[in-house]
């Protein structure tokens, strides 16, 4: 008589494929996952509580360290919340610089996902190509704000610095180059039979599951839900650009892959149009006091980050620090469907599924 015993395995918190200090406790029977329990909190720093003792401008660097692969969108959401409370009108040139910074950051973030996800399942070359192009974007953002990862660029009322001479032209040159490389990525990976066998039909969930788990971003759109805040609830100047929202139909790892790859192309369209419409001159920061005091009241805003819907709630008592601040962090919500996705899957698919959800632990733990 053959008898099998279930085994407990720890994936992380120091596993290279968890891309951060994330621990996953799995129970396996042979090679089949029976149960998966995420363990989070290793990177918790209490950002929201710390913010209660900081001035609004001082909070911005802390947002860089949540989703550190897409710091510009985090910068924007806190500024947008305060601006909403104050009723500020943002200068045109600042709006375009914000959009350019956020969309370049979105492309860079998706490049990290593409390269590392493929590296995790055994493809080394794409990782090198992805980081080659990402380095070009990081250099552009470095020229803009003097930092490579934690930018601290946005300000309540606009941005800290104007674009340096020749920067817009460099961004314009980058767009056709990136399109050419993107076509090469598809030639290299998207039609590869081995890759397709690893992602098609793996990690499937329904539209109903996605909505009930509060998923957002590509993790929601892969099921066929056409929802992107840049289109459905336009903020900043996104209503001035012509772009479409990629959606899937099956809700598997392949659909999540396709959605993000197509999002890179759509972000390139936005960048291209923003460069063409970029104002020749103008202020980059509205007239705001050095010490900002939001009026008494509360506000909630939400925007579309590379990982999904990031929100910021502020309650103000009229002082220079927020009375209460709360972030809706998309990675935290997207992570919650992982136990459902992994149950019954082969252990070989674990890393494929985890990489497809695309979490950032700085954002999960907050």
Swiss-Prot record:
Belongs to the complex I 49 kDa subunit family. NDH-1 shuttles electrons from NADH, via FMN and iron-sulfur (Fe-S) centers, to quinones in the respiratory chain. The immediate electron acceptor for the enzyme in this species is believed to be a menaquinone. Couples the redox reaction to proton translocation (for every two electrons transferred, four hydrogen ions are translocated across the cytoplasmic membrane), and thus conserves the redox energy in a proton gradient. Keywords: Cell membrane, Membrane, NAD, Quinone, Translocase, Transport. It catalyses: a quinone + NADH + 5 H(+)(in) = a quinol + NAD(+) + 4 H(+)(out). It holds the Pfam family Complex1_49kDa. It is found in: Cell membrane. The keyword Transport applies. It comes from Bacillus cereus (strain ZK / E33L). The lineage of its organism: Bacteria, Bacillati, Bacillota, Bacilli, Bacillales. It is a peripheral membrane protein. SUPFAM superfamilies: HydB/Nqo4-like (SSF56762). GO terms for molecular function: NAD binding; NADH:ubiquinone reductase (non-electrogenic) activity; quinone binding. This is NADH-quinone oxidoreductase subunit D.
